[in-house]
Amino acid sequence: MPRVKGGIVTRRRHKKILKLAKGYFGSKHRLFKSANAQVMKSLLYAYRDRRQKKRDFRKLWITRINAQARMNGLSYSRLMHGLKVAGIEVNRKMLADLAVNDKAAFNELATVAKSKLNA
């Protein structure tokens, strides 16, 4: 049985990694060893930050809701509790959008929440 060298397999594997490393600075897009390390690190960052993005957006929504709620004389937590007691199920993403783009509608929700808290 003749000896089979892995040249084609290795070249394919290297090409695949170097293709993923396109656009990286310096040797990180030229040399396989440093490109491979950087691609692995980049994939880890991408995986981590897909989860981080969800947390970041939730924090942003809460900040926007809180700012508008305080203009209506409520804290964020009291507003959310008031809405829950009133049976209004609006998620934070929609509330934040209302707080930025439709202040009148947000103010209506805030007055409803305030009245349910006082009642």
From Swiss-Prot:
Record-level GO cellular component terms: ribonucleoprotein complex; ribosome
Keyword field contains RNA-binding: yes
Claim: RNA-binding is one of the keywords in the record: yes
GO molecular function, one term: rRNA binding
Keywords: Ribonucleoprotein, Ribosomal protein, RNA-binding, rRNA-binding
InterPro entries, sorted: Ribosomal_bL20, RIBOSOMAL_L20_CS, Ribosomal_protein_bL20_C
Superkingdom of the organism of origin: Bacteria
Pfam families linked: Ribosomal_L20
GO BP terms in the entry: ribosomal large subunit assembly; translation
Cited NCBIfam families: rplT_bact
The family this protein is said to belong to: Belongs to the bacterial ribosomal protein bL20 family.
Entry function: Binds directly to 23S ribosomal RNA and is necessary for the in vitro assembly process of the 50S ribosomal subunit. It is not involved in the protein synthesizing functions of that subunit.
Protein name, as recorded: Large ribosomal subunit protein bL20
Protein species of origin: Brevibacillus brevis (strain 47 / JCM 6285 / NBRC 100599)
Encoding gene (name): rplT
